[in-house]
Amino acid sequence: MDPAFVDLVNRFGFQLLSLTLDPDKSTGICATNIYHCLSMVAAGSKDENLAAFSQALGFDVDALNETLQRTVKVDTYCKTNSAVEFSAASSIWHRKDFILEKAWLERMQMTFHATIGPLELQPINDFIFRETKGKFKNLIQSGDLAGTVLMLITCLYFKAKWQNPFDKMRTVRKSDFHTFNGKILPCAMMSKVDRMEYVEDELMQACFLPYQSEGNGPQWKAAVILPKQDGIDAMRGIMTKFSERPELLTKLLTGSGPNTPSSSGPPTGQTSMATSRTQKINLSLPRFSLQLHLDLKPALVNLGLGPTFKPSDDFAPISTGPLMISRVTHDLFLEVNEGGTEMAAVTVVAMSRSVQLNPVMRVDRPFLFLVFDAVTGLVLCEAVVNTLGRP
């Protein structure tokens, strides 16, 4: 994959993650999944909306086609490790009376291999359930479709086993985990003493746990990064560092780059990162399982996508007439235990008209007919019409 595009997606991910940080709960995203979904919408935008996507997603307006191709290549690359379960899927769901532009629809099918279907609960939820291996059941509710004319949904699933699993017999069933706000939560603490990649600098400690791997594709690992200082500000500082200088993150994760902070780098506290070295580490890591639901609109507006949440004709490549993004949500399942890691993600972009489409009511089957007083509510006549008599 193009290293510049990797940095771009990583920058977007840590910017977004930082904006969702909450002292009272966990947060988490699958940045590639969100980027994928927003890229599909960006492909149907123009003028001010396209400029907003360019700013938020970090691509050149003139390089939109190249960005779409790079987005798809990420999914293709990630599938090439046969020891890991990985899948990614795109979909478009629209009201039957909402006409999509043929060119955009064909582009979505050709580039993203998107599933196309009616905006109905059952097929949408079946798609999500299938593509996330059952991790999200009935994710979309009937209220989510109210006023919606178009919904773009991307799903991603990942499951991998540790190359060197944790011994369940060494897991301490009753241990403590200290949250940002000072609460102490009970946890099951896994532990191992083993040789592994490890790095430490003035901001953090980090270790890297490899997953089982086959083939010449991605070599998946988990990074566990622990701020040196307690509190949410220390965590935010690390994420800011990753988003402002994603090339440093890439060096940290790939093991390239200098072993010591660069003398020509940024000021103290923002130095380059040391390269990891393999050494014996005594690691204690809590077993955890997260199921998160995020409303991404505030964060995306902060990143520059504000214009896309207002009705305009700048989505004309998708459909003629005013159109706007009404909602962007992200759901994440993440479980880490002695055996490995399982993750599933769903991003939903819901779109609506600035003026709601007129409801269609075709009375061509039995109906109830009332004559009533609108002041008192008195019903003068009520009838079930099942035959019509004389026309």
Task: Name each region found by the language model.
Residues 24, 64-237, 256-355:
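Non-catalytic, conformational "gating/processing" segments within enzyme and secreted inhibitor domains
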Residues 332, 338-391:
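C-terminal soluble interaction/assembly domains
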Residues 52, 59-62, 67:
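Beta-strand-rich assembly/attachment modules of structural machines
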Residues 49-53, 148, 232-234, 292-294, ...:
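Extracytoplasmic/secreted cell-surface and envelope-processing proteins
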Residues 28-46, 147-161, 378:
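Hydrophobic/aromatic-rich, well-ordered segments within soluble, folded domains that form packed cores
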Residues 240-262, 356-361:
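Short, cationic low-complexity segments
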Residues 1-52, 355-356:
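Flexible propeptides and autoinhibitory/regulatory segments associated with cysteine proteases
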Residues 25-27, 207, 366-368:
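Short loop/turn microsegments at loop-to-beta-strand junctions
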